């Protein structure tokens, strides 16, 4: 099974629920970078991870795939080839979980949010406006776009970014992403990476959701000497 990466093109925080969960209004798209999964029924769940981005991906119960299988009441052996960079905000874990739900023919998009906030979008895929805490998916017409991804060597905690957003009083982001000022506050080194990326490509870089991935529209020419340590990935949007 193919599990495409997702990219958050824009994100507005529209409120905070009484339980502390943040409400969003975001545009998300699927990319042509994808993990590959082989899933077979088994008496207990096991996960094997290989591929260029396998390092750091857990194979125990902390892997979100376990939660997806528990939701649909199944156990399986899951072999994952990780082609999506880990920890950069591209939905690598969520899309693997969504692939498992598709394999199990689980179609309750709202319930899939109990596995993870990005799982509902990954279950639907394509291009969509995503609202609520991620469980409301409003499909949008597909738009073909070429995108250059810049993945710095830093892991960003999404909860930490939302906590920073709260502490800052709920700032609005100038670039269509309300989490960008919060991410830059929580992880000041992200600003240096943004500056280096914009210098290298001579155009604006946008933060993907809470980060740490930055992106630029188009397949950009760049001065790679300015981007030591940054993974540069050329991607395109894909239909669901």
Could you tell me what each predicted segment is?
Residues 92-93, 207-212:
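Glycine-rich beta-strand-to-loop/alpha-helix junction loops that act as flexible
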Residues 2, 10-26, 107-205, 217-240:
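ATP-dependent small-molecule kinase catalytic core of the GHMP/sugar-kinase superfamily
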Residues 65-68, 101, 187, 214-218:
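Short, hydrophobic beta-strand segments that form beta-sheet elements in well-ordered domains
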Residues 88-109, 113:
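DPxDG-like acidic metal-binding loop motif
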